[in-house]
Amino acid sequence: VPERTALNVHFKSPTDDYVKMFEQMEQDKIISTRGLKPDAVKYGELVFDVNSAYFYNHGGYEFAKQFYADAYKAAIKIVGGEQYILSAVMHADERNRAMSDALGQDVYHYHLHVVYIPVVEKQILWSKRCKDKSLVGTVKETIQQVSMSKKWDSKPALDEHGKPLLNANGKTVLRKSY
């Protein structure tokens, strides 16, 4: 419904087109494309969608705005930080035809779209070619790697005292995240 487009809520508006925003984040070293394949997925989208009747029964537009403001906060946690979110908009301009017809009045379908860059934290280790042999195998840098893969998202396995478990070589044992 075009006359309701102004009621859409932009929790985060894009500053440019997504490709340019991606390139700027790469230049600013917010993200890394190190090892990224040419056909890799560079963008993700979360859609928070709740049955129209829920909002209709709980206060409509104002209730939906607060609900999706909270959902946006959850999205920030899900994607790892607001800096990775390119845009987030709650749509308030789409009419639910079936409910509207059944109730004899306009009922709108509220939902939230969040477009983001998927990242995982990745530690880059010093290689065997490093001149200072004491550094080999230690963390050289930590990057935010653009990736939909969750294999880098593994967390250390902890003992009953909360300390990381080590394998026979003294390296931290990781719990698989997938």
What is each stretch, according to the model?
Residues 1-178:
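N-terminal nicking endonuclease/strand-transfer module with a His-rich metal-binding environment
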